[in-house]
Structures are given as structure tokens and as C-alpha cells.
């Protein structure tokens, strides 16, 4: 929607400069004729008039500017490089920089600055364009009405593209006031002067249509701003105005679909998208927007939120295909390799959304469980969005998932006999059980190549996590993030992690600072701390996998020191710290971390009151989209988390040869969960304890049954002589050949 403005902007530039510098009557006449020829599309005649003006006044740089604009429009806006070069030369000629604008004397150069801002906008240099636009806005009073509106619309577009919705809303209020005042002034003039003039009435009708179009555009911008702020109540009111002014046009239906997506009405959002008539859209060559690409992308976002990840990736691939087809058509028009911005309309410089779509695909593939494919998408996206710490975290998550190496049963937490018995060697009396090694740490992930090479290895994950930490601001406080859900932008939605969908829903009207994280939403204060917690947790895990125990302990300690920490990450922080301490032979410190009382909550997020969007239900979508991953990554309850702590605590006691305490921890944990949920590591721990106690036959029985035996007793329990003694009668079932147990 933003890129349909270049033609209007160019015409305004020409009008404002063409009539402002006339001195003689001849120059005024030539200037008027040039402007009329320009507005009617007769660029050859316009250039002839400008050439005559140039002969009369060779020192006026504004004539050169108008000539450059006219030639640009004559080429159907395909000579962006030439226009850009001319503007730079003119800026050097007048020795003026936008930073030096400090008074009304410099206002006459405003057209030059505005043209530069338009080009910067189309080259995606938004920060520089905003700098120029804001300087122009300071001196907007003397500008003629049409040019002032063009400056404001450009700034609004830039604010929305850079997620500064509050600034955009303020400027839109100014625009509304400006348009209504201008309309009242025109009505007054028409009543006094042109009541009987047929041309005057036609002009009035045309200006009325332009005003209605401007109002419709303002309403659409307001909806986009409210969508960014997740202010669903305000958005609901404004959507009605959009539908009244724009009808069932594709942009209005896309906006309403995005609104329903945020409310969680996914089926309605899909229905609205399907009802849009894409065929009526002018096409990307005129607007710079590939509506088909946006359509498939937004469908992918919606299906991601519905946890239909395979359908989501299907739609994202369709969007990528559409985008590639459009880019192929655009590149066919470029003939001069030295002028990469020429050979196609300037508005199409914003058409390519490949990297945003790759980002979406990567997040979706990560949820499907295809980390290597996700890595390939995200590693390409990070070359463009290298300043996004959240993207570096996602890359690290791809590396971790690709190197996890767990079977489906282990992922579900079920004991597998493969995880206990590796093989049986020998025959007869000499047969032996070879227990599987549970040590997956310190694996050599690197096969000799540099860890800086982008491969889905744990070494590269460590680099990604370092980058992510370095990109976070030093002084920031307050968490809120985690999984990778997505956020669709009304006409070209980018998917992203659920932290942005969820936490941006908090009203941040207090102007809290945020850092950009393109192509997704910016990271605000709450999200930044939560992102930091996730990065520290992943860093500790990766350091343990690489055998860097001191670094792992450092990351785990930093994680536990965070002021707002989710229960799940606090649980992981204690586990990682304990594992690092055990590897450093600091068992006593590790036991402190393994206290089950440390676990009081295993929720993925932090309880907060930030969901203040009233009765609208839009925020549910972030949790719905991430719900399927949670059970795989975290214990499902506090009870199961405490059993994990007890199993690990038992292992720590074994290392200190406190076998009675270890046995007590083991069976306390086993009593808290279903026998089938006991992990293979706990069964091996029970085998080890029985061997240390001299109960070889009981150890063999545990291995054969592949579960902890309920009647395992300590010496103090044996004296009680209970009626229930199932272990001894079962012993004859054992194969007598299993006499020796050894660890490979």
C-alpha cells in the first residue's frame, strides 16, 4: 500500500518547484506550461518547456531538478540510478545538507530533500529517510497543502515500516486535521468565485474524490498502526471506517483478515483472504506489491497459529514461488549491470520479499521438526537481517535440534531397552551384558573444519548465541519471549517468534525503548529480558555439549540471576548448573542446585497482567501456536520436574558414595511417576546401586524387566518382613548365564 505513492510524490515535487521561481512573465508562462504538460502526462512537451527555461536561467538548480523528475517519469520511473545521481550532484552544488536546515531560508530546498527521502524509502534505507522526513516536517508550515500532505504520508509510511506506531498515529491525526481544514477553505473559495463555472464544479468534484481517497488511505494507515500495537478494541472501531470507505477492496479485506487473525478467529481470517479479488489489483509493476505472494504468506501465518505447520510450510513455499516468479520478471528488464536500480519501476524495488519469506519458512520448519531445512532458510535470511538477536537464537536452536540425536521414545520420556542394553557378548557361562553408554557429552561435532563455517553444528550454535548476546542492549531489564510463533502484517505479514505476537500486545504507550528486529516485530523491554533468558539457557546447554563446563556454569548462573525468569528456564538453569558443577568435581554445590524444592513452577512464560486488550481474544493465538512444542521440551508438571531433579540428585549422591541417600532419592522419584515414564538413566542408576550393594541378581532382574522393581528394599526395610515379597519368586525367570554386568 505504501509503494503506490511514487507517481503522486513525483508530481508534487514538480509542481512545487516548477511554479515557485518564476521571475519574468515568459518564465512564468514556460513554468506553467511545463507543469500542465507534466500533469497531463506529456513529458516530451514538458521537457521542451524546461529546456527553454534552462536556456533563460542556467543557474537555477530547480530547473535541473524538474528536468530530472520529468525524464524519470518519461522512462516510466525506471531510471532510478540516474535520478539518484542527479539529486546527489544537486545537493553538492547547493552545498546543503539536511542536518543544516535551521530556518525558513532553507525551505526552498525542501523539494530536493523530499526527493532524496523518496529514493531512500525505495532503497529500504528507512532510518536515513526518516531523518530527512522529520527535518522537513519541522518546516511544514510554509509548504503548499499538497506537498505538506505528501511529506506526512511518506513519514507515516516510514514510521509504520519501522514499527513506530505511536508516532504514525500522531502524524495521522495531523493529516486528518490538515485535510479537513483544506477542504473547508476550498469550499469557501468555490462558493464565492466559481458557482457558475462548469470547470470549477468539475475541479471541485475531482478535489472531493482526492480528499475521499486520502481519508480512506488515512483510515487504512490507522488500522495498520493499531494492528502493530495490538490495540484490538481501537482497531475494531477503525476497521468499520475502512470497510465503509474502501469497500471490499483487496487492501481492506487483507487488513480485516489480519485483525481477525490477531483476535484468534482464524477461520474468519482465511475466509476474508479467500474473498479478496486479487485479479482486480493493478499488479506489482504499478504498486510494487505482489498480492499473490502476500496472500499465500498470510495463509501460512494463519495456519501456523492454528498449529497446522505442514499446511503452513506449504503456503509459505507457494509464496516463495510467487516471489521468485516476480523477481525473475523484474530482473529480465535490467540490462545494465552497473545500474542495479534501473530497468524497472522504482516502486518494484520494494517487491522482493524473499528473505522475509525464508525467515517464515525457517520458523515453520523448526516447529515441524526439520531443523536442517530450517537452518538452510534462516542462514540465508541472517545475511540480510544480521542485527536480529532473535534470528541468531533460532539458528542456534536449529543446530541444537539437529545434533540432539535422541530417538522418538527418548523424546517422549519413555524408557527404551536400547537405551540400557547395548549388546550381549559371549556364550554360555561367559555371556555378558554390555550396557549402553549414556555419555553423549563432549561429542566431537566438528570434523576439522572451522566452526565459523555456517554448518548446523554445536560449535556454530555457540557462535550464534554469542552474536545474539552481543546484539542485546547492555542495560535492559524485563523478560517475555520464547517459542517461534508468527505475526502477519496486513499486506505482507512476517512470521516471527511468539514473543513478539504475545508481548507486543502489551500497550507500550509509555514510549519504552525497543530495538529493531527485522523482519519481525521490534523487541521491547519485556521481550528483551525474556530473549536474554532463552539465549543464556541455550548457551549453557551448548557449552555443556562442547565440554566447556566453566562457561556452562557461567551462563547457568547468569540465567538464575535474571530478575524475571519463567519456571521452565529456572528448572533448566538449576539442572545445567548442577551438571557443570559435577563435571568440575564440585558435588556439594551441585547437590544444592538439585534440591527438588527449587522447582515450584514449570510454565513457559511469566505471569503478567499485560494482556489488556479487553474482551477481544486475539492473544490466545500465540499460545495456541506454541502449544505442541512445550511437552517435548519441558516436563509437563511440577511433579515430573521434581522427579527429574531427584533422579539427578541420586546420581550426585552416588558420586559421593552415599548409596543409601541415592537409593532413597531414586525410589522417591519412582513413586511420583508411572513406571513406564522412568527414564533409562534412572534404571541404569538402579542397576549401579544394586551392583554396589552386591545384589547382582537383582540388577539383572531390573535390566530384564526394563523398569524399577517396586520391592527393592534397603537393609532397614528387610527387617520389617512384609507379606508382599514379589522379587524372590520371580528370580528363577532370570537367565543364569547373565552373571557379569559391565559398562562399555
UniProtKB/Swiss-Prot annotation:
Polar residues bias locations: 484-495, 602-612
Family annotation (Gene3D superfamilies): Tetratricopeptide repeat domain
Region feature (Disordered): 1-25, 183-204, 477-521, 602-634
Keywords annotated in UniProt: Acetylation, Coiled coil, Cytoplasm, Nucleus, RNA-mediated gene silencing, Transcription, Transcription regulation, Translation regulation
A biological process from GO: regulatory ncRNA-mediated gene silencing
Domain of life: Eukaryota
Coiled-coil regions listed: 74-107
Compartment(s): Cytoplasm; Nucleus
Biased segments, Basic and acidic residues type: 1-16
Modified residues (N-acetylalanine): 2
Composition bias, Low complexity: 183-199, 496-506
InterPro entries registered for this protein in UniProt: CNOT10 (IPR039740), TPR-like_helical_dom_sf (IPR011990), TPR_rpt (IPR019734)
A Gene Ontology term for the protein's cellular component: cytoplasm
SMART domains in the record: TPR
Function, as annotated: Component of the CCR4-NOT complex which is one of the major cellular mRNA deadenylases and is linked to various cellular processes including bulk mRNA degradation, miRNA-mediated repression, translational repression during translational initiation and general transcription regulation. Additional complex functions may be a consequence of its influence on mRNA expression. Is not required for association of CNOT7 to the CCR4-NOT complex.
Subunit structure: Component of the CCR4-NOT complex; distinct complexes seem to exist that differ in the participation of probably mutually exclusive catalytic subunits. CNOT10 and CNOT11 form a subcomplex docked to the CNOT1 scaffold.
Family: Belongs to the CNOT10 family.
Protein name (record): CCR4-NOT transcription complex subunit 10
Organism: Macaca fascicularis (Crab-eating macaque)
Upper lineage: Eukaryota, Metazoa, Chordata, Craniata, Vertebrata
